[in-house]
Amino acid sequence: EQVANIDDAQYEELWDAARDYNQSLLHHPNDFILSDEQQEIYKSLLDIGGNGIMGYIEIPMIDVMLPIYHGTKESVLQIAVGHLDWTSLPVGGAGSHCVLSGHRGLPSARLFTDLDKLKVGDVFMLHVLNEILTYEIDQILIVEPQDTDPLLIEPGKDLCTMITCTPYGINSHRMLVRGHRIESQEEPKDIRITADAVRIEPLMVAP
Protein backbone atom coordinates (compact mmCIF):
# COMPACT_ATOMS: atom_id res chain seq x y z
CA GLU A 1 0.00 0.00 0.00
CA GLN A 2 1.32 3.45 -0.72
CA VAL A 3 2.83 5.42 2.13
CA ALA A 4 1.39 8.90 2.63
CA ASN A 5 3.28 12.09 3.39
CA ILE A 6 6.24 11.42 1.09
CA ASP A 7 6.83 14.08 -1.52
CA ASP A 8 8.54 13.77 -4.90
CA ALA A 9 11.89 14.98 -3.60
CA GLN A 10 11.88 12.35 -0.85
CA TYR A 11 10.94 9.64 -3.34
CA GLU A 12 13.87 10.70 -5.52
CA GLU A 13 16.23 10.39 -2.56
CA LEU A 14 14.96 6.86 -1.93
CA TRP A 15 15.44 5.91 -5.59
CA ASP A 16 18.94 7.41 -5.63
CA ALA A 17 19.98 5.52 -2.49
CA ALA A 18 18.77 2.21 -3.94
CA ARG A 19 20.45 2.84 -7.29
CA ASP A 20 23.71 3.77 -5.57
CA TYR A 21 23.53 0.49 -3.68
CA ASN A 22 23.02 -1.41 -6.93
CA GLN A 23 26.03 0.35 -8.43
CA SER A 24 28.12 -0.80 -5.47
CA LEU A 25 27.25 -4.42 -6.29
CA LEU A 26 28.96 -4.06 -9.66
CA HIS A 27 32.28 -3.85 -7.83
CA HIS A 28 31.65 -7.21 -6.14
CA PRO A 29 29.87 -9.26 -8.83
CA ASN A 30 30.61 -12.68 -7.32
CA ASP A 31 29.95 -11.93 -3.65
CA PHE A 32 27.01 -14.06 -2.53
CA ILE A 33 27.22 -13.09 1.16
CA LEU A 34 26.85 -9.51 2.34
CA SER A 35 29.07 -8.12 5.07
CA ASP A 36 27.44 -6.99 8.31
CA GLU A 37 27.75 -3.39 7.15
CA GLN A 38 26.20 -4.20 3.78
CA GLN A 39 23.34 -6.03 5.51
CA GLU A 40 22.50 -2.98 7.62
CA ILE A 41 22.47 -0.72 4.58
CA TYR A 42 20.48 -3.27 2.57
CA LYS A 43 17.74 -3.62 5.19
CA SER A 44 17.27 0.15 5.38
CA LEU A 45 16.68 0.66 1.64
CA LEU A 46 13.15 0.87 0.18
CA ASP A 47 11.66 0.08 3.60
CA ILE A 48 9.51 3.19 3.88
CA GLY A 49 6.85 1.37 5.89
CA GLY A 50 9.32 0.08 8.47
CA ASN A 51 7.98 -3.47 8.05
CA GLY A 52 10.58 -4.99 5.72
CA ILE A 53 8.46 -4.68 2.58
CA MET A 54 10.28 -3.17 -0.41
CA GLY A 55 7.43 -3.44 -2.89
CA TYR A 56 4.95 -5.80 -4.52
CA ILE A 57 5.07 -8.19 -7.45
CA GLU A 58 2.08 -8.50 -9.76
CA ILE A 59 1.79 -11.39 -12.24
CA PRO A 60 -1.47 -10.87 -14.17
CA MET A 61 -1.41 -14.16 -16.11
CA ILE A 62 -1.63 -16.22 -12.90
CA ASP A 63 -3.53 -13.65 -10.80
CA VAL A 64 -0.74 -13.06 -8.28
CA MET A 65 -0.10 -9.93 -6.23
CA LEU A 66 2.34 -10.41 -3.35
CA PRO A 67 4.59 -8.27 -1.16
CA ILE A 68 8.35 -8.47 -1.59
CA TYR A 69 10.38 -8.61 1.61
CA HIS A 70 14.08 -8.04 2.21
CA GLY A 71 15.88 -11.39 2.32
CA THR A 72 14.78 -14.99 1.95
CA LYS A 73 14.32 -16.23 5.50
CA GLU A 74 11.93 -19.15 5.75
CA SER A 75 9.55 -17.00 7.81
CA VAL A 76 9.28 -14.72 4.77
CA LEU A 77 8.99 -17.45 2.15
CA GLN A 78 6.15 -19.15 4.01
CA ILE A 79 3.90 -16.17 3.37
CA ALA A 80 5.44 -13.87 0.75
CA VAL A 81 8.15 -13.34 -1.85
CA GLY A 82 11.74 -12.76 -0.75
CA HIS A 83 14.45 -10.73 -2.45
CA LEU A 84 17.87 -12.42 -2.70
CA ASP A 85 19.98 -9.99 -0.74
CA TRP A 86 23.11 -10.29 -2.89
CA THR A 87 21.25 -9.30 -6.05
CA SER A 88 20.17 -5.88 -7.33
CA LEU A 89 17.36 -4.09 -5.55
CA PRO A 90 14.14 -3.90 -7.61
CA VAL A 91 14.66 -0.40 -8.97
CA GLY A 92 15.72 -1.24 -12.52
CA GLY A 93 18.51 0.35 -14.51
CA ALA A 94 21.13 -0.91 -16.93
CA GLY A 95 23.47 -3.40 -15.31
CA SER A 96 20.95 -4.62 -12.73
CA HIS A 97 19.49 -8.07 -12.06
CA CYS A 98 16.92 -8.39 -9.29
CA VAL A 99 16.13 -11.95 -8.12
CA LEU A 100 12.90 -12.80 -6.28
CA SER A 101 12.26 -16.15 -4.60
CA GLY A 102 8.95 -17.78 -3.74
CA HIS A 103 7.70 -21.19 -2.61
CA ARG A 104 5.36 -23.53 -4.49
CA GLY A 105 2.82 -25.99 -3.22
CA LEU A 106 2.39 -24.75 0.33
CA PRO A 107 -0.95 -25.85 1.82
CA SER A 108 -1.43 -22.41 3.38
CA ALA A 109 -0.49 -20.13 0.47
CA ARG A 110 -0.36 -20.20 -3.35
CA LEU A 111 2.64 -17.90 -3.78
CA PHE A 112 4.67 -19.06 -6.85
CA THR A 113 2.77 -22.36 -7.24
CA ASP A 114 1.56 -21.45 -10.75
CA LEU A 115 4.85 -20.05 -12.02
CA ASP A 116 5.16 -22.98 -14.45
CA LYS A 117 2.07 -21.70 -16.30
CA LEU A 118 3.95 -18.62 -17.48
CA LYS A 119 5.49 -18.48 -20.94
CA VAL A 120 7.90 -16.31 -22.89
CA GLY A 121 6.18 -13.03 -23.76
CA ASP A 122 4.09 -12.81 -20.57
CA VAL A 123 4.71 -9.80 -18.35
CA PHE A 124 5.01 -9.13 -14.64
CA MET A 125 5.22 -5.87 -12.73
CA LEU A 126 7.10 -4.64 -9.69
CA HIS A 127 5.32 -1.94 -7.69
CA VAL A 128 8.13 -0.07 -5.94
CA LEU A 129 7.77 3.27 -4.15
CA ASN A 130 5.84 5.53 -6.56
CA GLU A 131 6.58 3.64 -9.78
CA ILE A 132 5.73 0.46 -11.66
CA LEU A 133 8.52 -1.51 -13.35
CA THR A 134 7.31 -3.89 -16.07
CA TYR A 135 9.25 -6.93 -17.28
CA GLU A 136 8.58 -9.19 -20.27
CA ILE A 137 9.56 -12.83 -19.83
CA ASP A 138 12.31 -13.80 -22.26
CA GLN A 139 13.80 -16.94 -20.71
CA ILE A 140 12.63 -19.90 -18.61
CA LEU A 141 15.29 -22.29 -17.31
CA ILE A 142 15.42 -25.39 -15.13
CA VAL A 143 18.75 -25.58 -13.29
CA GLU A 144 20.53 -27.31 -10.43
CA PRO A 145 20.16 -25.49 -7.08
CA GLN A 146 23.84 -24.53 -7.04
CA ASP A 147 23.80 -23.03 -10.55
CA THR A 148 23.78 -19.29 -9.94
CA ASP A 149 25.30 -18.18 -13.24
CA PRO A 150 21.88 -17.28 -14.77
CA LEU A 151 21.26 -14.92 -11.83
CA LEU A 152 24.32 -12.75 -12.34
CA ILE A 153 24.26 -9.20 -13.66
CA GLU A 154 24.64 -8.87 -17.42
CA PRO A 155 26.33 -5.62 -18.50
CA GLY A 156 23.87 -3.10 -19.92
CA LYS A 157 20.77 -5.21 -19.23
CA ASP A 158 17.85 -4.50 -16.87
CA LEU A 159 16.67 -7.93 -15.67
CA CYS A 160 14.46 -9.50 -13.02
CA THR A 161 14.25 -13.24 -12.34
CA MET A 162 11.63 -15.12 -10.34
CA ILE A 163 12.92 -18.35 -8.81
CA THR A 164 11.07 -21.31 -7.31
CA CYS A 165 11.55 -25.03 -6.69
CA THR A 166 10.66 -27.68 -9.27
CA PRO A 167 9.38 -30.30 -10.08
CA TYR A 168 6.29 -29.66 -8.05
CA GLY A 169 6.41 -31.74 -4.86
CA ILE A 170 9.96 -32.98 -5.50
CA ASN A 171 11.89 -29.71 -5.49
CA SER A 172 15.20 -31.11 -6.71
CA HIS A 173 15.81 -28.27 -9.19
CA ARG A 174 15.08 -24.58 -9.59
CA MET A 175 12.86 -22.87 -12.15
CA LEU A 176 14.16 -19.48 -13.23
CA VAL A 177 11.68 -17.19 -14.99
CA ARG A 178 13.54 -14.15 -16.28
CA GLY A 179 12.22 -10.92 -17.75
CA HIS A 180 13.77 -7.84 -19.32
CA ARG A 181 12.46 -4.35 -18.62
CA ILE A 182 9.93 -2.82 -20.99
CA GLU A 183 7.91 0.38 -20.87
CA SER A 184 5.13 0.30 -18.29
CA GLN A 185 1.59 0.80 -19.54
CA GLU A 186 -0.20 1.48 -16.27
CA GLU A 187 0.01 4.20 -13.66
CA PRO A 188 1.00 3.52 -10.04
CA LYS A 189 -1.99 2.76 -7.83
CA ASP A 190 -2.84 1.89 -4.27
CA ILE A 191 -2.10 -1.78 -3.63
CA ARG A 192 -4.81 -3.88 -2.04
CA ILE A 193 -3.75 -7.42 -1.15
CA THR A 194 -6.64 -9.84 -0.72
CA ALA A 195 -4.99 -13.25 -1.07
CA ASP A 196 -1.98 -14.90 0.61
CA ALA A 197 -0.26 -11.75 1.76
CA VAL A 198 -3.09 -10.56 3.98
CA ARG A 199 -1.65 -12.78 6.72
CA ILE A 200 1.71 -11.01 6.87
CA GLU A 201 2.65 -9.11 10.00
CA PRO A 202 5.94 -7.25 10.52
CA LEU A 203 6.86 -9.22 13.65
CA MET A 204 6.79 -12.47 11.67
CA VAL A 205 9.83 -11.41 9.68
CA ALA A 206 11.69 -9.45 12.29
CA PRO A 207 15.32 -10.57 12.90
What are these regions (language model features)?
Residues 1-207:
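Solvent-exposed, non-transmembrane regions of membrane-associated and secreted proteins
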